[in-house]
Amino acid sequence: PHLHDHSIEVQLPFLQRVLGEFTFLPISLSHLSAEECRELGQAIAQVYEAENSAVGKIVLAASSDLSHYLSPKETERLDALALEAILALDPPGLLRTVEEENISMCGVIPTTVFLFAAKALGAKQARLLKHCHSGDVAPMREVVGYASVAVEF
């Protein structure tokens, strides 16, 4: 699974910086069906509900780039489609959109599992914190899209 999901080593330094010392359980995912994503999301939600009060605050996080190596205009268009499904808390819609639009979102599976878990935990809304692409830092013809989204439950 690590071949397709390298988000742990990308996010871990940020988490260590913000949280200091903490315990975490990484889940590295590769190819799962929509049903497997739903089942795993529900299992994560069950563990969250069972353990959250016992161990203190549990934070669930998923990490992914959005579109890869496209023009800024095309990246913004495709990212907007994926973000629409994410902000609607629509895991099947995200999978469908990424497949139908051929969006190169490398973490679509972890994001889908996260959305299923969030919905199982009663999430009602997601909020876009920031959306940008690598061309926002320096002009370039091909960019990678990024976004941060908060989901409260």
What are the language-model segments listed below?
Residues 1-58, 69-153:
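Flexible, D/E/H-enriched segments
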Residues 66:
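Active-site metal-binding loops of divalent metal-dependent hydrolases
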Residues 60-62:
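Residue-level marker for buried hydrophobic side chains located in beta-strands
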